Amino acid sequence: MPTIQQLIRNKRQPIENRTKSPALKGCPQRRGVCTRVYTTTPKKPNSALRKIARVRLTSGFEITAYIPGIGHNLQEHSVVLVRGGRVKDLPGVRYHIIRGTLDAVGVKDRQQGRSKYGVKKSK
């Protein structure tokens, strides 16, 4: 606990909040090009093959982004839109690819939660 004299000499420094998605540079989304599309396994206790992509963003960063939904058409050189948001059981994956924009098509036969997977309303 500082004394009053110490506080007069130098005031308390505010804690600076670090951003959880620095590659977006304050933007809501960023465009990028896939450099590698592959699968990886999650941390314990989960088990799956999660689809992820290495993406080179327009901000110059090379990031790892998660591809949500069942099935995708992404491959190397696909242009994608990336948003923030981590995947809890994949260490180092702090971004999501937005489905239904640019080269990432929406999830096929999706009926519920369509807006999150870029699917138009079926008639």
Swiss-Prot record:
GO cellular component: chloroplast; small ribosomal subunit
PROSITE patterns, per the entry: RIBOSOMAL_S12
Any coiled-coil regions, as ranges: none
Cellular compartment(s): Plastid, Chloroplast
A Pfam family it matches: Ribosom_S12_S23
Record keywords: Chloroplast, Plastid, Ribonucleoprotein, Ribosomal protein, RNA-binding, rRNA-binding
GO biological process terms, semicolon-separated: translation
Main localization of the protein described in the UniProt heading: plastid
GO molecular function: rRNA binding; structural constituent of ribosome
Lineage top rank: taxon: Eukaryota
Role, per record: With S4 and S5 plays an important role in translational accuracy. Located at the interface of the 30S and 50S subunits.
Classification via PANTHER family: 30S RIBOSOMAL PROTEIN S12 FAMILY MEMBER (PTHR11652)
Known partners and oligomeric status: Part of the 30S ribosomal subunit.
Stated family: Belongs to the universal ribosomal protein uS12 family.
Name of the protein this chain belongs to: Small ribosomal subunit protein uS12c
Organism of this sequence: Marchantia polymorpha (Common liverwort)
Classification of source organism: Eukaryota, Viridiplantae, Streptophyta, Embryophyta, Marchantiophyta
Gene: rps12
